[in-house]
């Protein structure tokens, strides 16, 4: 005897039982987005558009869904991947005319927060770390102090921009 998948069972009941008799329990597909955004391997999973596109499309394809829920737990990572995931969520939400509700677990920072901003509503615990979109590079300039002390520094690179954040 063949075993039926959850999707096959759901489709069967949709065909056999009229919608008005099915109970009225709202369907809200959930997509979990966890980890660093960007490059991933089997041993180090991460969030990339190629890794989550099918999950998002599947969540937005539920026939009677009232909304799509995203669970975000990410410190951020690649700005490009963050934006691609954000954009795909908004495209699907607009196309399917479904609201997106985002739940931030422990952290939704940097690119994780950017993805969360694709939601129509963001919910989190009071202890969750939320916010901070942007790339920051901090450095100090000691060139005058080094010159006064007579220190000479030599750096050899294959291009000028490779040391543009060098504080010396």
Regions found by a protein language model. Name each.
Residues 102-109:
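Glycine-rich beta-to-alpha transition loops that act as phosphate-gripper elements at the mouths
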């Amino acid at each position: 005897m063949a075993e039926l998948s959850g999707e096959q069972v759901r489709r069967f009941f949709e065909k056999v039982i009229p919608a008005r008799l099915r109970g009225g329990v709202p369907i809200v597909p959930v997509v979990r987005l966890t980890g660093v955004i960007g490059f991933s391997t089997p041993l180090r999973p991460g969030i990339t558009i190629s890794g989550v596109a099918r999950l998002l499309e599947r969540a937005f394809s539920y026939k009677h869904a009232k909304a799509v829920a995203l669970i975000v737990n990410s410190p951020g990572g690649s700005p490009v991947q963050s934006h691609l995931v954000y954009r795909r969520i908004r495209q699907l939400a607009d196309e399917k005319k479904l609201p997106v509700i985002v739940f931030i677990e422990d952290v939704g920072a940097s690119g994780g927060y950017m993805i969360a901003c694709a939601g129509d509503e963001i919910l989190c615990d009071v202890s969750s770390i939320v916010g901070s979109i942007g790339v920051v590079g901090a450095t100090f300039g000691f060139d005058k102090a080094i010159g006064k002390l007579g220190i000479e520094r030599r750096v050899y690179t294959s291009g000028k921009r490779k040391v543009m954040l060098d504080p010396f």
